[in-house]
Amino acid sequence: MAADYRNPESIIEKGRARLNPPPLYKVILINDDFTPMDFVVKVLRHFFLMNEEMATKVMLKIHIEGAGICGIYPSDIAVTKVQQVNDFSRQNQHPLMCVMEKE
């Protein structure tokens, strides 16, 4: 079947492209026995934009359960947050570790 190039609608397939949402990743802080609780709260407030109350709740969850989710993001944002938190922890001589895992 020959296309009629004078009529663009004859060569353009009608329909919508279906885009899947990007995969999401959980950014998780891992508890350790050396990082002060107030430093964890500072990290949560600075990098995850939590208010004092929410940061304290998440910090206690991390302390009690051994780990806690700080946020859920697309891959590139999650990678950036993990790197920023781990770099900040090292700069402040704390072993606090941040990781990400697929949701």
Curated annotation (Swiss-Prot):
Gene3D superfamilies on file: 3.30.1390.10
Pfam family, one: ClpS
SUPFAM superfamilies xrefs: ClpS-like
InterPro entries: ClpS, ClpS_core, Ribosomal_bL12_C/ClpS-like
Protein origin, superkingdom: Bacteria
GO terms of biological process kind: protein catabolic process; proteolysis
PANTHER family, per the entry: ATP-DEPENDENT CLP PROTEASE ADAPTER PROTEIN CLPS (PTHR33473:SF19), ATP-DEPENDENT CLP PROTEASE ADAPTER PROTEIN CLPS1, CHLOROPLASTIC (PTHR33473)
Family that this chain belongs to: Belongs to the ClpS family.
Classification via NCBIfam families: PRK00033.1-5
General function of this protein: Involved in the modulation of the specificity of the ClpAP-mediated ATP-dependent protein degradation.
Subunit structure, as described in the record: Binds to the N-terminal domain of the chaperone ClpA.
The name this protein goes by in its record: ATP-dependent Clp protease adapter protein ClpS
Species: Nitrosomonas europaea (strain ATCC 19718 / CIP 103999 / KCTC 2705 / NBRC 14298)
Lineage summary: Bacteria, Pseudomonadati, Pseudomonadota, Betaproteobacteria, Nitrosomonadales
